Amino acid sequence: MVLVGQGMEPEEAFTKVQVVYYLSRGGQLQQPHLIDVPVSTHSNGLYLRDVKRRLTSIRGKGMGDSFSWSCKRNYKNNFIWQDLADDDKILPLSDGELVLKGSELYTGFQEKAEFMDGQFDPENASQLPNKIKKLASKKFDFEAVKRSLDMESDKLQEQSDLAAALSLSLQLMSDPHMKRFSKDKSMDLNQQVMNSLSQAKSNAAEECMLDHSVTDISSETLHSEESTVQKFSFNETIRERSKSTASASSSGTDREHSYGPPRKTESMGRERSLPRDLPRSREVSRELPPQVPREAPREKSREMSRELPREAPRELQLPREAPRELPREVPRETSRELPREAPREISRELPREGPREVAREQPREVVVPREVVREVSRELPRDVSRDSSKAVKDTAKTRQEKPEELPTIKTKKSPTCSESGDSTPFMLSPRRLMAALSSPSPEKKFGKLVHSSSTRSSTPSTSAASTQCEDSLPNINIRLAKQATCLSNFRLCGNANPHATDSRPDSPEHPLAAAAQPASGAVPQSPNTRGHQGGPYWPRWRSGRKPRTSSEGKEGPEPPTPPRGPMTKPVTVAKPDPPLKKSFEFDMNVSGVNSAMATPFLQTENNSPSSSESSSAAVSSGKKPASISLSGTSDASDGGNGASSTASSSSEVQNNVSVKEVITQQLPSPSSSEGRPSLNIDTASLPRVSISEAISDVRETVKTTRPDSPESPMKPNPPSSPVRTQLSSSPSFNKRIEDARARARSLVSKEIRSGESRSSKDLLKENDRVKTSSGSMRSGSTRTPNNKNGTTGAGSKTLSGTFNRSPPRINSIMWEDAPLTPTKKEFVNRDDRPLTAGRTNLDWEKTLQEAASLSLPPPDFGQILQECGQCGRTFKPDSLKVHMRGCHALRRSKDFQPFNGTSVAIRTRLQ
């Protein structure tokens, strides 16, 4: 309570003083109050008892005694609250105001808190104020609290009682030994449980108190009742067990306590609905299982199966004294000789009486270690497992289909191996052959495959003979390489050239024709080939059709549909193979070209007599080594004229590249008389590229293939058939290229010496003009007008060019360099112009910078810049047109007034 006194005017008897007071409740000051306190004129000042007397007359009794009072006074340029008693004088502030604050008594607040907590002491009640005494004398309403607590405890008790009773009844009914109780005993047990529950509930209702002791008592009684019921059930089960054991020992035919079908009781129906995850007794009786007669109906057998304990049959199904027919451990020597079908044969030979006993005892008795099974599967070939499966064919009637046989590659016995006995055929799958073919060292890969197959097929008795056969490994490698090429030709199908009659596999001149014929003369036919009318693993061409040309419009030879299914029939080689030539026919993608190119060169390095003879014959005859021919299919072709063009870039050339033809003749070179190795490119619909061992240079010539030429092994081409182009380099051609480069270098040096700032693009244009002029000089003939791709070419480094399908009359040299990228007109945006660092991109500043850089007089901005009529910004005329399309200024500026240079100079100075 703050008391503010203003203007203490002296009177004869009393004077009134204004006092401002604040009341503090709960640590917070309330709104201030103002009262007038009468003061006698004879007193020295205003005392606290005068203020309390005035508050009691205004606010009621106990108002002054319920608070502790303090006055506000100045202290060191600040103020403090000074506590006051009844006889203390209230000191005014510097401005003469009287301010009081009333705080709640600490003693009264503490006693009130203790009383609410239940720690109220009636002995100290005389020391409290009168109002607090009256509050303490009132009685606390315990009845309402007790009723609410009773309702909560009843609900909790009902829930706990029901849960406990249900769990107890479920435990009793789930006990397998309690099933033997009679109906009277089960009813007595249920009645006892219900009595215990009702007694516990009544005790809980009587002893329910405020401190929640009722729940503790009821839980204790419930636990005690549970323990008594459990003890009773345990004693009953012990008695029943003793009776059952005694009756079983006295007479084995007593069915009263056996596991036979008992009488239906009320607990049986209750048991079927019980959950399976309830705790059950783990004790299993050692009694024999019940003997169910065959004439019993299904319902009785189901009831018996439900009544039987689930743990008993696990130990009573099989007798443990079963005879052991096989040892647990098999020695490694004998396990290696066992075929893969040994476990199946053993299981089939076991007696069929008692299937459960045999099925249970078999994994215990026949224990084959995992290492033994792995070694048997690694050491034994697949033929041995097939033979063993044939031996057990009578017993395995359910197995009707045999597994698919993989293609076997059989070789003829060598002279060194004929003495040791019959040779076992090598089991090499096409996957292994293709992996060996695509490896960087196919010779080593084939050697490893042959060695592994020979060691698999050899037995301990023929180990000495296998060492003698190692001398003939190179010959076997050669034959396997040829057979691998045949398999790859079949698996990776391609389009053979119809004109190359000598390179067709079905022709008698082909080096692999003899190796592909079987011994009996019959051709095995693959059942999975669709539309394929041939036996060997290469496509046969259909006879009776002429090759189609673009001019005649006749039907050409159609490539056969490649086989899509796996190879199932083996290819057997019975005749001695002819001498190996230095290249074979493949069909593969671009990724396999490198491996296909490396394969013949590695095969020519073999130590076989056939390869050495063929290489020596080639050297003696003066011909160069044989080469691998690559062919790429051209998709672009014209209509009636028969002109076609292949892909010019290296990415387009890499589309479909496949080895197509064996070229063994020497092609003459125009630049040299010895016939140096070259790169031949045929511009037919299936162009062939023959790459020799060493490519020294690249030249381009065009020659026609005549049918009467002794050099050409091809068929006579039709009049409109494509011609063969041969790329080479001549000294005159190289000299022109060097001259053009020298001119370009001289131009660059002249520009540098003269100091003229010419761009690099101009120099490139000049160089391109020089090259095109030199190319037109050396071409000597017009290019074909039927070319679809336009002007495309390739350099000498990339080995790719434009192969134009030209008429047969062309007999001249054609070469064009790859043109540079077409030059475009330079367009530099006004914002992308080079500016000095630190400058802005405004148009007028750009103009000033351009004028300063070019040493020009300052421009007239009135003629260069124009102001926007909407937003007032200045732009160049072309920029203003663009700006006006998107200018959305809200306010319009004044009319356009072009300013001159002086105003701009003044504006720049001000800025």
Curated annotation (Swiss-Prot):
Binding-site residues for Zn(2+), renumbered to this chain: 868, 871, 883, 887
Region (DIX-like oligomerization domain): 15-107
Compositional bias annotation for Low complexity: 452-467, 511-527, 608-662, 772-784
Residue stretches of biased makeup (Basic and acidic residues): 253-286, 295-407, 696-709, 735-771
Region (Disordered) residue spans: 219-470, 492-810
Chain ranges of zinc fingers (C2HC/C3H-type): 864-893
UniProt xrefs under PROSITE patterns: ZF_C2HC_C3H
Domain of life the protein comes from: Eukaryota
Compositionally biased intervals (Polar residues): 414-423, 591-607, 663-683, 722-733, 785-805
Any Pfam family matching the protein: SOK
Cofactor: Zn(2+)
Keyword annotations from UniProtKB, A to Z: Cell cycle, Cell division, Cell membrane, Developmental protein, Membrane, Metal-binding, Zinc, Zinc-finger
Annotated GO CC locations: apical plasma membrane
Membrane topology: Peripheral membrane protein
Family: Belongs to the SOSEKI family.
Note in the entry: 'Soseki' means cornerstone in Japanese.
Function: SOSEKI proteins locally interpret global polarity cues and can influence cell division orientation to coordinate cell polarization relative to body axes.
Domain comment, as recorded: The DIX-like oligomerization domain is required for polymerization, edge localization and biological activity.
Subunit structure: Homodimer. Forms long polymer filaments with other SOKs proteins polymers crucial for polar localization and biological activity.
Protein name: Protein SOSEKI
Organism: Marchantia polymorpha
